[in-house]
Amino acid sequence: MHLTIHNAHNGLTTSIQKPIRYHSYQSFKEYIVESFTNYILDDANNVFLLTQFGMRVDFNIINELNDIYFFDKRLFVNENPASILKDYATQTMRDIPPPKHPSLAPYSRGLNIRQMSSSLRSNAGWSMSVKVDAALADEQVRAYKRQISVMFRCLSIMFEFIASFTSDIENSFTKFYNHINQLSLKTLHEHWKSHYKTLASRPQFTFKNGKSVRLADMLNYDALVEASQFVERNLSTVIDQFNQLSATINEVNKSKIDIDGEIQVLRDESIAEFASLKASESLVEDIKSIGTAISTEIDSIASSESRVLGDIYTKHVESSKKLDEKYVQLYNDLTKLDQFKDKLAEKGTALFRHCARLQMQMVNVKLALNEFDSRKQEGKQRSAMQKVQEIKKKEEYLSLTIDLPLLFGFAIIEMRRQYEWYDFFASGAVSNVTEQLQVIINQERVFRKIWAKKIGSFLSILDSLPSDLSQTLPSLDVTVVKGREDFFGKFWIHDIQREDIDKYIKWVGSIDAGKHANFSMLLERNFEDLIKSTNAMKSVTKAIGTLSSYTSPENIDAVQPNDKKEDQDLIQGYKNRIRKLENLLHQQQFKDLSTWPVIKGATQDQSIIFNPKRNSGVGSDNVLVHSQHDAKILLQNHRSSIKDESSSRTDHLKLAKENEDLRKRLQELQIGGERRVEAKVPFEASLSGTKILAQQNTEILAQKKALEMKVDSQLQVIEKIQKESSEKDNEIFALKKQIQDLTGEANEFYARNEELKKNAEVKYDHLVQELNEEKDKSSSLSSELDAMKRGANDRKDAEKAIAELTSVASDLYGKLVDHSHITFDYVLTLSYILEKMGLMLTNEEGKNNVFKIRRVKGLRSRKQDGENSQTDVGSPVPGAIKNMMVWSHTDINVNPADMIESAKEIINVCRNKMDETFDKYNQVVAFRSNVSIEQVSEHDIRTIEFFSNAVVKRFKDVEGLAKKLAKEKKTYETQLQKLTRKMSAKVTLSNFQTNDLVLFLPTRLETKEPQEVIQPWTAFNIGTPHYFLKSQPSVEREWIVARIVSIVEHTVTATNKNDTSLNPYRLSEGITWFSVEAKEVSQ
């Protein structure tokens, strides 16, 4: 059994033998950093491991896992991961040589045998190298396929992890959100007054004993007002907070959909782009078969003639071209896979960072939810959940305006029930128990007296027993403690009768018949429960009355055999039902497990679909068999002719000649068979093309049928259009009739128009007369107009002066606004400087108009971490001052056409808006009379300055802190020197460095060769072997203690393994050893 580790960033996998023998999770991570990533990671804390179900790895059950997936945490936060991805890519990179085209020139008659044989042999060497390169490329293609599959699997696993993480937080948020939503839906802080008025309008209810109750008097009106105000202040804030969290969660869910879509796009792209890679195995097989054929034919070219060698040369030229084309195709597929893998690594890293951002958003949501969980709050501050609980209490108090009749009914029913229960308990159960127990004691006393009379006299003779046996029995004292008024206290109403409860239920039903008709029904059910409770107490009292009667177990078994059988049947039925429920539970658990996301692993299918070499061999065998069959027939004919005409010498010569012809024909048939083999390849290609054409033909026929169906549908549409056109023709005919009718009406209209013209001419004459009269009036008005113009000139001069004054006032107002903004910028800058120094400008407690500079711990570090701009300050004072500048947001529009209105606007702004707000703004910005200053010293003149006083005080605090830190530094340096001197006298056992004190011991080399070697002195160590002393001490010494002067690192390689000068200690290849130069320390 092995544990497989998958790298999410390059698809690399490794296996570890189980059980895992690491003692801690940290050591297991360090192993991954060391062996799996080759120290691309510098810290084991950056290792992030997940299981195949998207869960964090639990080291306690790691031996039960089969696969874990490794992620580099740095890629989740690094915005420029190119260098890290490059390091991971080099782990899986393998140098595959690019295609080298064949150097075999086309055949020409000028080539001699020597040139052709030399070219063919060099071409054979090229084909062998192509075969080797193709095998390497095919192996790399398979590796890339597995690695890309692992990377896709890791993307899905990370998505499952983020989905699970967000869903858990979302579920907890939903519980809180539903609770808050119910509060917002059922709030009564706006409508409680109407319900209170309805409650106050109810009449008093009078009990049977004469006592009356008015329900509205039980509520405190001031408390109701305070509750509504509290809910109004705080409920909207809580709802806004949860709406913001809900928007964040919706955004996260949308981002999850986007991530899932991007992963699916990458999968579709890989499927579409690498659908043709399935034929890579056939390419490799073709390359092998072609290369093998070239190498096989090269062995026979030494004995070949010039003509046969030319045919082989021509054949090798064509084969080399095919071999080169197939290797180029294989190399291009490899290049595409490499490029897609790099693209997938970059896109996957971007998706990992996106997942990390979603996780941080949900962590913020979780932190916000923790504020509403009272179990996770510390300190004495009131948590947000306590505020919600208080809102709920206030809402419950407001709900009493509706539910008080029902609650009061429940209360009086419970009072009566407790009264009856107490009555039965005290007078019935307790008194009966006392009587029955006393009867039992009396029976025991009588039994003991009878027994003592019969047996006791004999036993009294024995010395070991007392002469007088004790006849005392335990005493009995059953009393009732506490009364029945403790629970309700002052709310207790004495002498509540069942008639009162029945009357109250009818009273509630008659009043609340419209809004709360179910109140009376609920009260009736509760009243029935009271009756059941009292009847149960009656049964208990009756059962207590039979305590003194005794029934033996035998009689019970005899009396109730049927009851036992029924109980056993009932128990057996329950057992069967429990078994069925357990089976259903196991089925549901299996169903849940089967619905978990299962990601398929990389396929390991490397089977060969077909073997072109075998097919080509079969074809060539058929041709050769056919040619051999023809040759056999000819030889048989030749033999028969020899038998028939063996006597004739001339015939013998003819047969010899004929035999020679048959040999030539046989050679021609063999050459023809080889040519048929070569011709079969394009024939198979044409056959596959024919199949493709046939498939295309079927598709065309299907398209033809679809087009015919489409034509039929179009014909139906045309018929429909023709019907509609005939209907349109009928409508046109009807419209023509309407046009004829309208022309008749138009003729009548023209006749009326002539009459109207005549009337208009008459009216025109009257208008001419009136026009003459108006001309006379206009002459008189023109004279009046001249007088008005003279007055207008004087007015223009005055308006010009007003316009100049208005523009000057507008400019002054603008400059005043600019100066106010500059002053506010100074305040903002001073606040920013103070916060950079750890101070904050705030309002004094209880005085909003008095300002104070106070020290705030952690403010400076937060500012440095956040890198906020100068305008982003934490002090509320600049915001309050900015709110005072409301008057500065009022723009004065100077209208050149109406300067009087502009002047009125300026006056209105300056008097109505600036008088109060501007003076208040000036008083606040001055920081003179409205500040609280803490003096630095009694005689310091800077105490009258507000900001400089705080800065000076802060600098003095920093100066005092610097002195304190300098003093602590000197103390720590002294302690460091002491520890250094102390540690320099201790022997080092691991991680040797210069100036370490080391114990060296002599060792010996185990070698079979009888030669003199240097006796090694190695450092006594723990987990740090191969540290040898450079200088050889005296042979008689058994140990030495020396201080390291220098350490030189050496590595045993294949070249220096047997060199005694470079490997004097006969170490194995690949071992790193260190030559230590040390100075002996005297005792």
Swiss-Prot record:
GO terms for biological process: autophagosome assembly; autophagy of mitochondrion; piecemeal microautophagy of the nucleus; protein transport; reticulophagy; ribophagy. Residues 562-591, 648-812, 953-988 form a coiled coil. Keywords: Autophagy, Coiled coil, Membrane, Protein transport, Transport, Vacuole. It is found in: Preautophagosomal structure membrane; Vacuole membrane. Signal peptide: none annotated. Its main location: membrane. The keyword Metal-binding does not apply. The keyword Membrane applies. One of its GO terms (cellular component) is phagophore assembly site membrane. It is a peripheral membrane protein. GO terms for molecular function: molecular adaptor activity; protein kinase binding. Pfam families: ATG11, ATG17_like. Involved in cytoplasm to vacuole transport (Cvt), pexophagy, mitophagy and nucleophagy. Recruits mitochondria for their selective degradation via autophagy (mitophagy) during starvation. Works as scaffold proteins that recruit ATG proteins to the pre-autophagosome (PAS), the site of vesicle/autophagosome formation. Required for the Cvt vesicles completion. Belongs to the ATG11 family. Homodimer. This is Autophagy-related protein 11. The gene is ATG11.
